[in-house]
Regions:
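Amphipathic, non-transmembrane alpha-helical secondary structure
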Residues: 82-89, 112-120, 124, 179, ...
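Active-site-proximal beta-strand/loop segments in catalytic clefts of secreted hydrolases
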Residues: 2-5, 36-42, 100-106, 135-140, ...
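Surface-exposed patches in mature extracellular/periplasmic domains of secreted proteins
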Residues: 31-37, 135-136, 195-198
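Sec-exported extracytoplasmic/periplasmic mature domains
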Residues: 22, 26-30, 103-104, 124-131, ...
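Substrate-gating cap/lid alpha-helix
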Residues: 119-179
């Protein structure tokens, strides 16, 4: 699991989609561990940094965002990268099927095509680029609609894509939406034959 954790604090351990997915896997007889590489309240630049995308690439995005803003005030996630711990940047997920869920807090210039490109930057850090899932949700600031986002991301990722708006009408940061998202990810893992009860 790479990207956003929308349930902040201790409650994440129970109600976030990562926790719910782990429970669903176990309850359904899968002996698989969900590896949590998410950030609470982090932008996509920080997620790329955590995945090991080069500083040069990250600086390119920052420069582009500043240029687009043309002197206007930018959200911190559009230019800021978190200080990450060694534990956060250590890749213990290289043999996993990446489930990429990012963009809620910004960092992609309100441009779904750039978000897709950033998702690909993260996917490219994995040895197996053929097995993955991307989940999309409209950003917290509603600067891009679900329809616009889904159109670009579903075209880019095809059968690998899950639109959270198609799965639940609940706001993405609610427990209900997190539950629905975990169920959709499990269904997609099964549908694409990524997991087995071995």
């Amino acid at each position: 699991m790479l990207g956003d954790d929308l349930i902040n604090g201790e409650e994440s351990n129970t109600y976030s989609y990562m926790a719910v997915l782990q429970k669903l896997l176990t309850d359904n007889g899968y002996n698989l561990t969900v590896i949590n590489k998410t950030l609470q309240g982090g932008g996509t630049l920080s997620m790329m940094k955590m995945a090991g995308v080069s500083d040069e690439t990250l600086q390119g995005y920052i420069a582009k965002h500043q240029q687009t803003a043309n002197g206007a005030q930018l959200n911190v996630t559009e230019t800021g990268i978190r200080d990450l711990t060694d534990e956060q940047t250590t890749r213990n997920d290289m043999d996993c099927v990446p489930v990429i869920f990012m963009g809620y807090y910004g960092g992609w210039n309100h441009d779904p095509a750039e978000l897709a490109e950033q998702q690909e930057q993260i996917l490219n850090t994995f040895p197996d680029k053929s097995r993955f899932i991307v989940v999309g949700t409209r950003p917290m600031d509603s600067s891009v609609s679900s329809d616009t986002l889904d159109q670009v991301l579903s075209q880019k990722w095809g059968e690998h894509y899950i639109s959270l708006a198609n799965v639940t009408a609940q706001p993405s940061a609610t427990y209900e939406a997190q539950q629905a998202m975990a169920e959709a990810v499990l269904q997609k893992l099964q549908e694409l034959n990524y997991i087995s009860k071995g």
